Design a protein with these regions (language model features):
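Sec-dependent N-terminal signal peptides
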Residues: 4-13
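Domain-level marker for long, solvent-exposed, non-transmembrane regions
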Residues: 17-236
Length: 236
């Protein structure tokens, strides 16, 4: 089990700082920079008439393969402790929108031309696009929710100058917790203290409901809590 920290800001916006990545055979889910990547492989077709055409066709095949891999990876993304994207994808509208979004994936780096004449290409999509599709169309923030008009736009600001707490870092290392796009934080009585309704839709799409970190040092430098965050140990 990988160790990580998550951070709740003073406005109850959540961030798990950098470095938490789920590596897969065909790509990765980076919960730190909120991105999903997949590697596609293309082989030179036998009907290519010249080297230039062979390369173009191999790149096209690699992209198509990466799109298929991205769909597979997105299906496995954890939404909450109990659900994955595959559950949401049974909805035809969501399925169509997600597939359309994935078709707009951007290449990462340059193609890798392998000794067996195949080509590898990496493509990536931001989690924000997935959030924009699966989150309810309207989430009305309360005055203290991140993203509401009454919430501070920048962390640290007045609270830091006044010596107040700028955020809460919950140390989840050693727990059976796993990264998710939209986890809930519960108190010891099982009551939700962070989750749906505690943040605006706009905030969740633009910033992510959560972020991740492997180290306390990285968490303390996160811009949403930087200044004077407190650290609390998670218990379950």
């Amino acid at each position: 089990m990988k160790k990580f920290l998550f951070i709740i800001t003073a406005l109850f916006g959540l961030v798990f700082a950098q470095g938490v990545v789920t590596q897969l055979d065909n790509g990765s889910i980076n919960y730190s920079d909120q991105s999903i990547t997949a590697v596609g492989i293309g082989f030179v077709p036998t009907n290519a008439v010249n080297a230039g055409q062979a390369r173009r066709m191999a790149l096209r095949i690699a992209k198509q393969d990466a799109m298929r891999q991205l769909i597979e990876i997105v299906n496995g993304v954890t939404l909450t402790s109990e659900t994955t994207m595959s559950g949401a994808m049974v909805d035809d509208v969501i399925n169509t929108k997600v597939r359309g979004f994935i078709r707009g994936a951007r290449p990462v780096g340059q193609p890798k031309y392998l000794s067996d004449t195949s080509v590898e290409m990496e493509y990536s999509v931001p989690m924000s696009g997935i959030s924009d599709i699966i989150l309810p169309p309207v989430t009305v923030p309360t005055p203290n929710q991140p993203g509401s008009d009454n919430a501070s736009a920048a962390p640290g600001g007045d609270a830091t100058q006044a010596g107040g707490v700028t955020g809460v870092i919950i140390d989840a290392r050693g727990l059976k917790a796993r990264p998710a796009m939209a986890p809930q934080i519960l108190d010891q009585n099982g009551n939700a203290i962070y989750g749906p309704g505690k943040y605006s839709r706009k905030y969740a799409v633009e910033n992510g409901v959560v972020g991740y970190s492997k180290t306390l040092e990285a968490a303390q430098k996160d811009q949403r809590v930087v200044g004077n965050p407190i650290v609390v140990k998670g218990v379950g």
